[in-house]
Amino acid sequence: ANDFITNDSQVVVNGSLTAQLGNNEKAQISLDGGTTWIDLTVTGTTWRYTDGRTLTDGTYQYQVRVIDNAGNVGATDSQDVVIDLTKPAAATITVDSVSQDTGLSDSDFITSDNQISLKGTLGAALGSGDHAQISLDGGATWTDVSVSGLSWTYVDGRTLADGDYNYQLRVIDDAGNISATTSQVVTIDTVAPDASKTIAIDSISD
C-alpha cells in the first residue's frame, strides 16, 4: 500500500527509475543506513526487492541509489516502512439498535422507516491508527463510522426500498490488523397489512 504501513512481516519493496540505467550504472538498496548496499534487479525502469528478513513490529528504513562503476552517486531516495503485527485493543464491536425500530420488539431490527441510522458499542477505546468501519456491500468497500468513547453511530444516507439489508462492522488498524467483526440484518417493511382483511369483535360469551 502507498502508506507504507503493513501487517506483513516479510516485505517486498517496489520502485521505479525515471530512465533506464546505462551500461556502467546500477541501482542499489541499503537496509542498514547506508553501510552496505545490495544490487537491485531492474527491468526497464522498474525494480523490485524482496527483504528476506522476518520483521517484527517497528520502523525500518530502506535507502536506494543509482551509482556508476566509478562510484559516482546519482539519484537517491529513502522510505520508512512500519511493521505492525498487533491487533487493536477493541476485541468486540456490537450493533445495539436501529433508529425508529418499529417492529413488534424495539430490538428486532425491523422498521417501517426507510431512512435509518445504526448505533453500537466497542469493547475498548480505539487507539491511534484504529478505525471502526461499516460495509453496506458485503465487504467490498468500508466506511469509518463516528466514534465517541465506546459508542459508535452511522447514518445510512440512502432511501431504502422494502427488503433486508446486511450491515457488516469491523475494527481495523492502519496496518490492516482486524480485531473484531460483526454483522446485522435490518428489515425495511413499509407495506401495511392487506386492507381487505378486516378484524371485528362480534360478541362476548355469557
Language-model regions, residue ranges each:
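Short, solvent-exposed loop/linker segments at the N-terminal edge
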Residues: A1-S9, Q100-N114, S205-D206
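Aromatic/hydrophobic beta-strand junction motif of beta-rich domains
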Residues: V13-A19, L118-A124
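Short beta-strand segments within Ig-like beta-sandwich modules, predominantly Fibronectin type-III
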Residues: I38-G44, T143-G149
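Surface-exposed, short loops/turns at beta-strand junctions within beta-sandwich domains
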Residues: D51-T59, D156-D164
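Flexible, low-complexity linkers/stalks enriched in Thr/Pro that connect modular domains
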Residues: A75-D101, A180-D206
